[in-house]
A protein has these predicted regions:
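Alpha-helix capping/helix-boundary segments
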Residues: 101-103
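Short, Asp-centered acidic motifs that coordinate Mg2+ and/or phosphate
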Residues: 93-95
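Secondary-structure end/capping motifs
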Residues: 137-208
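Short beta-strand and adjacent tight-turn residues that come in two discontinuous sequence segments
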Residues: 97-99
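A conserved helix-loop-strand patch within extracytoplasmic ligand-binding domains
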Residues: 1-90, 112-122, 128, 134-138
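Structured segments of extracytoplasmic/periplasmic soluble domains
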Residues: 15, 27-34, 63-67, 105, ...
Length: 208
C-alpha cells in the first residue's frame, strides 16, 4: 500500500471486466503501473489478472486463500518486453479483487495481507443501474415509477437515519439467509481492523 510499484509482478484473481477489477485497473493507472492484458501470460513488470472460477468474486477470494494455504498455482506463459519467452511459469495468487463479504473472508483466513484500494478511493465506480425490458417498462409505467420512487426514498432514508440502516441490514440478512443483521450493519459502515500488527479495512459503502 505504501509502495504501489511493488505491485509489479503480482498475480490477482479477479472477475475480469467487473467493477472491482475496474477499481484495481484505475489504481494501476493512477500509479503508472502496467496492466498485462493477456490473462494467459505472466509479465513480471505488470499487474497480472487471472479469471476466477465461474466469474465469481467470492471465488476470487477462495482461490487466493487456496493458493496461500496449499500452494495452489496457475500456469502462465512468461512474457518479457511484450514477447513470449517460451517458458511456462507456475505462479501463486498474490491477491484478489472482490466485494464485501469477500474482503472479510480473506482477512479472516489469512495473515500478512492488507487492502490496497477500494471504492472509497474511486467512488464513481459504485453507480447503480436498473436494467429492464423496454417493451415491458413502457407497458407498466406505473410499476416502473413506483420501483424508482421507492428505491430513491429508501436510499435517502438509509443515508440519513440509522434506524433505516439497521432495518436494511435486517433485510439483507433475511434475504440472503447469511450472517446476522449486526454483521451486515458493521460491514456497511466499514471496519478498521488489525491482525498481527497489520491494519486493514473491510466493508464500507458510499451510501453512508
Amino acid at each position: 500500500k505504501e509502495n504501489p510499484q511493488s505491485m509489479r509482478g503480482v498475480v490477482i484473481s479477479s472477475v475480469i471486466g467487473d467493477g472491482d477489477w475496474v477499481v484495481a485497473v484505475n489504481y494501476a493507472s493512477a500509479n503508472k503501473i502496467p496492466i498485462n492484458p493477456d490473462a494467459s501470460t505472466y509479465d513480471a513488470n505488470a499487474i497480472n489478472f487471472v479469471p476466477s472460477q465461474d466469474d465469481d468474486y467470492i471465488n476470487s477470494v477462495k482461490e487466493l486463500i487456496k493458493s496461500q494455504k496449499t500452494g495452489y498455482t496457475v500456469p502462465l506463459k512468461e512474457v518479457v518486453n511484450g514477447k513470449l519467452t517460451g517458458k511456462t511459469l507456475d505462479r501463486k495468487i498474490d491477491g484478489a479483487t472482490t466485494w464485501t463479504p469477500g474482503d472479510k473472508m480473506a482477512f479472516d483466513a489469512l495473515s500478512g495481507f492488507t487492502d490496497v484500494v477500494s471504492t472509497k478511493d474511486f467512488v464513481k465506480q459504485m453507480a447503480t443501474s436498473i436494467v429492464v425490458v423496454k417493451e415491458w417498462a413502457l407497458q407498466h409505467e406505473k410499476q416502473v415509477i413506483a420501483i424508482l420512487k421507492q428505491s430513491y426514498t429508501a436510499a435517502n432514508q438509509i443515508k440519513q437515519y440509522d434506524e433505516w440502516a439497521v432495518k436494511a441490514s435486517e433485510c439483507v440478512a433475511k434475504t440472503y439467509n447469511l450472517e446476522t443483521p449486526k454483521y451486515w450493519y458493521d460491514l456497511f459502515k466499514g471496519q478498521k481492523c488489525t491482525k498481527d500488527g497489520l491494519e486493514y479495512n473491510i466493508g464500507g459503502s458510499k451510501v453512508f
